[in-house]
Amino acid sequence: MIECGITTDVRGFHMRLQTLSENGENKMKKIFSALAMIAIVAFSLTACSGTSAETDSASGGKATDYSRKESWLQIPEITRDVDTFYIYSTSYFETSFEEGAPDYAALDNPEMLKGAQGEYVTNASVFEESTNVFVPYYRQAGMRYAGEVRKKTGNIDAAISGISYDDIRAALDYYFENCNSGRPFIIAGHSQGSSLVKYVLQNYFREHPERYQRMVAAYVIGFSVTKDDLEKYPHLKFATGESDTGVIVSWNTEGPKNVKENAENAVALPGAISINPLNWKLDETYAPASENLGSFMPNMDAGRYEITDIGADAQVVLKRGVIVTNAKWDHPAAAEFFGPQSFHEDDYTFYYNNLKANVAKRIAAYRSR
């Protein structure tokens, strides 16, 4: 049994990482490693009571027990009147291709833990200024297995709809029953995490409308929400501007080469909808880099993440349902199934300060309803 919250002292870590001596890609890897090691040693306990959260899973086994502190990256000290429930992206990557590797990461899988803890700093931290950020660990599908399922079926639904969704559902039950205390909330994720957020929106909140009505917004970033999704699940609404509430906010970021070649991108699905994270429009109105309040990028010389200007403009490309940018950044997503110039890994960081401001704006709009 745990008390809400378990705090991981990650606020501000990105501003005080030690300087690293390596150059190039090795330095990038060291930055992520440093982020992870900082988070690993930062656990401490604070206050809120809870009961056991072990539940029978939809797939027939036992979901993860979220009454155990080891099941959470963070249950924060409550200092805000709005929460964020964040689901991290695929971190079980390289080791998932090893011979005999399981399809799903165990909760103590070192590669997954490091990736999740690093992603807290680069992505989930954007919600810290306005909300209490909750982040569960979950048994996620490995990159190898997700790729195999996608090859067979055309999507990764079968990979995430069992074990992974069972864990997220159990984590949500624990959160709402023991830690939320009736506060409004945001749910957010990236990549595989966002695909799970979609499952939550489509299924969990349909089963729990009393919880859904307190949702400020859902940030389904780095995975597609499509027109078909909205037709099939009429209780879902996509954002139409910068301050509507109870809505889905989503985009996938690409460079001009992906668009020019009409390249296949695993997260850009047919019928996808993206909102422009600079001007918050759904049409193809161009937003110049001058509207970008700051990107959150690694400084390879200093060995830390910092707010900077990389010329990250944004424009919706309606025929692909993505955002295209001319950002001055030479590190597109490595996996070939994202296309030659996808900025999948930078969906949050390119538009970090605009997203932070948008979170505050939607919360203010929710309060004034």
Residues of each region from the PLM?
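Surface cap/lid and interfacial helix-loop subdomains adjacent to catalytic sites
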Residues: D166-S181, N203-Y352, K356-A365, R369
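Hydrolases whose catalytic domains are alpha/beta-hydrolase-1, hotdog thioesterase
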Residues: L196-V200
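Short, Lys/Arg-enriched N-terminal segments with co-localized hydrophobic residues
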Residues: E3-K27
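C-terminal motif of bacterial Sec signal peptides marking the signal peptidase cleavage site
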Residues: T46-A47
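Gly/Ala-rich beta-loop-alpha elbow adjacent to hydrolase catalytic centers
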Residues: G189, G193
